[in-house]
Amino acid sequence: MASSCELCCEIFIAILLPPVGVCLRHGCCTVEFFICLILTCLGYLPGIIYAIYAICFLHRDEYFDEYRRPIYYVA
C-alpha cells in the first residue's frame, strides 16, 4: 500500500497528465494505462476521472500475488 504523500503526488500528476499518473502506479504497458490514454485523447476530464480511480481504487498487487495464480494441470 502506498503512503499518503506518494498517493497525493500521484493524484496531482494524474490531474496534470492522467496517463503519466497511471503509468507511475501500474506501468506503461498495462491495460489501465491504455484505457487512460484513450480516455484522455477522447476527453481530458474522463481521463482524469479514470486516472484517479485507477490510482486510488485499483490494486494490481491483489490480483497477481502468489496465492491467486491459476493452477495448470498437464495431462
Swiss-Prot record:
It is a multi-pass membrane protein. It comes from the Eukaryota. One of its GO terms (cellular component) is membrane. It is found in: Membrane. Keywords: Membrane, Transmembrane, Transmembrane helix. InterPro entries: PMP3 (IPR000612). The chain crosses the membrane at residues 4-24, 33-53. PANTHER family: GENOME ASSEMBLY, CHROMOSOME: A04, HYDROPHOBIC PROTEIN RCI2 LOW TEMPERATURE AND SALT RESPONSIVE PROTEIN LTI6 -RELATED. Belongs to the UPF0057 (PMP3) family. This is UPF0057 membrane protein At2g24040. It comes from Arabidopsis thaliana (Mouse-ear cress).
